[in-house]
Amino acid sequence: MKAPVRVTVTGAAGQISYSLLFRIAAGDMLGKDQPVILQLLEITPALKALQGVAMELDDCAFPLLAGIVTTDDPSVAFKDSDYALLVGARPRGPGMERKDLLAANAAIFSVQGKAINDHASKNIKVLVVGNPANTNALIAQRNAPDISPRQFTAMTRLDHNRALSQLATKTGTSINNITKALIWGNHSSTQYPDLHNTLVDGKPALSLVDQAWYESDYIPTVQQRGAAIIAARGASSAASAANAAINHIRDWALGTPANDWVSMGVYSDGSYGIEKGLIYSFPCVCKNGDWEIVQGLDINEFSRAKMTATEKELQEERDAVKELLPA
């Protein structure tokens, strides 16, 4: 059996984490031969509820669960951490402007970025789930100068999975037969679900669906799926978000399938003309615990306009919290 790895989860008593932690402990994220120590962070008022979650984890008697730490102290939660899933974030309250939400989360993620910098393994892999995920990831990354910016990612895998599901339903095929689905940009309603390179049973997806459906049905459905779930369920996506987080880390740690890619919010190196330093969703392949952006895709005018629109939103979000970002 391998030595245990330390997995930090923030917002650990929340809805997403309740769907996430048991699957991590069962080996769904890092494999059935990888023991884990869960290091669970919550705000002080939620520590009692977190204790209850820890009791339930104990009661599952998971063979791979080598230990549990519960704390409200980031320096304890991130100590020697190998993986961190930053799930906890300030939700948008009534009458709250977007810039207020950005500022409230900037305070949270700057503290966590510093704690990661000072206490975590230098090889840590960080996934930000809490929204606004891309900009929260940027804030954490900028507050961790001793950690490579490549180690901070944001989750667009839920959007990617939604895109797969919508296309599978439309074409009457199994999700297993679809490759190269793609989300560009921000995890928000400006994201661009791009089918120009997607294959269904090896055939170009856009040869199987009409352009009108693609532009006026598929794209807005994927963009607005989160809001549709809130309207239906009375609460935001939790189990599907947890599932996507597991998919994201598993592929990053263990590798993506041959002849396919995944969508990941990663540090832009200027690929496809996207401003360097933004956390932007690109097509990525992973192997040996590292990711790289797929290069050489043709970008037509339609795609370029959509990619630029979501880039602009990310620039605006960054500029709104500029004074909170270290130089």
Swiss-Prot record:
InterPro entries listed in its UniProt record: L-lactate/malate_DH, Lactate/malate_DH_C, Lactate/malate_DH_N, Lactate_DH/Glyco_Ohase_4_C, Malate_DH_AS, Malate_DH_type2, NAD(P)-bd_dom_sf
Residue numbers binding NAD(+): G11, A12, A13, G14, Q15, I16, S17, N105, Q112, V129, G130, N131
Top-level taxonomic group: Bacteria
UniProt GO BP: malate metabolic process; tricarboxylic acid cycle
Keyword NAD: yes
One family name in Pfam for this protein: Ldh_1_C
EC number: 1.1.1.37
Physiological role: Catalyzes the reversible oxidation of malate to oxaloacetate.
Family statement drawn from the similarity comment of this UniProt entry: Belongs to the LDH/MDH superfamily. MDH type 2 family.
Name of the protein described by the UniProt record: Malate dehydrogenase
Gene behind this protein: mdh
